[in-house]
Design a protein with these regions (language model features):
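Intrinsically disordered, low-complexity terminal tails/loops enriched in metal-binding residues
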Residues: 15-276
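Sec-dependent bacterial lipoprotein signal peptides
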Residues: 1-14
Length: 276
């Protein structure tokens, strides 16, 4: 399994399609607060991922409940917009959007304008408030990079519920449930995040590949500064078991979203873990 880890910086506050509301998700200088990015896959363990600041063009007029077309660019090593992207897990860019408080999650795959490098994704913010944006990408022959930003969305912004650890446990998701466990959770060490996907209490037998893998995992710390995007170990013990390797950079609460495909639909199972 390849694990690439990078320190991330949340961009200064500035004022996508599948979404999940939990229940069942001009270049600025980075501010303080390093975070982490884990990207699981195949070989070359331990490579460092590059850091960048996402340049969000759509800044004004964003409001909860109103469809928006988000436009942004991500930089190359020289600071210019990337125009050519390598395909990773069936997409050129993975665009993750999470509300502060971690009660809203979206994983989008934006369109790319090869002439300008401008990326665009349509999204309707379900709630107002501050959103953390993460764009995972790689130039051909380059290294994995994560660009970040924050954006403020107008409209009703109800406070998110506080985070409480709920693993190990049987957790409800969107039209699916899973027994979720996190083994070896310790700051600075790789843990194993295991999902046993169930339907009606019975193991499912029909999981489908989603974006080139049997699942995707995104995990973010309570403050939004630590970020993990991992892909599974394909050597599963059973057809309904999906296991991810994920390194948690620092102690504290983290919320995760496991994504699995059944019947042509992507299902999301959220969980919360406290890392010592």
């Amino acid at each position: 399994m390849r694990i690439t880890i990078a320190a991330l910086f949340a961009a200064a506050l500035v004022g996508c399609g599948q979404k999940h509301n939990d229940h069942a998700t001009k270049g600025e200088k980075p501010h303080d607060g390093a975070g982490g990015h884990t990207h699981g896959g195949d070989e070359h363990a331990g490579h460092k991922a590059a850091l960048a600041v996402l340049d969000l063009k759509t800044r004004d007029g964003l409001k909860a409940g109103v469809a928006a077309k988000l436009r942004f660019t991500v930089p190359d090593a020289g600071g210019k917009p990337v125009r050519a992207f390598a395909v990773a897990h069936d997409a050129k860019v993975h665009f993750i959007l999470i509300r502060q408080g971690l009660d809203t999650f979206a994983h989008l795959h934006p369109d790319v304008d090869p002439a300008t490098g401008v990326l665009s994704a349509e999204y309707t913010f379900p709630k107002g408030g501050v959103y953390h944006l993460f764009a995972d990408y790689q130039e051909p022959g380059g290294m994995p990079t994560t660009a970040t930003a924050r954006v403020e969305v107008g409209g009703d912004a109800p406070p998110a519920a506080g985070l409480k650890a709920d693993v190990p446990g049987l957790l409800a998701g969107e039209m699916v449930a899973a027994k979720v466990s996190v083994e070896g959770a310790k700051a600075g060490s790789e843990a194993k995040v295991r999902f046993e996907v169930l339907d009606g209490g019975k193991p499912v037998t029909d999981l489908e590949p989603y974006m080139g893998a049997m699942g995707h995992l995104v995990v973010v710390s309570a403050d939004g500064k630590q970020y993990v995007h991992a892909h599974p170990d394909e050597k599963a013990a059973a057809k309904n078991v999906v296991t991810f390797g994920a390194a948690f950079p620092s102690p504290g609460f983290y919320k995760g979203w496991g994504q699995f495909k059944r019947g042509g639909q992507v299902r999301v199972v959220p969980f919360v873990v406290q890392v010592p």
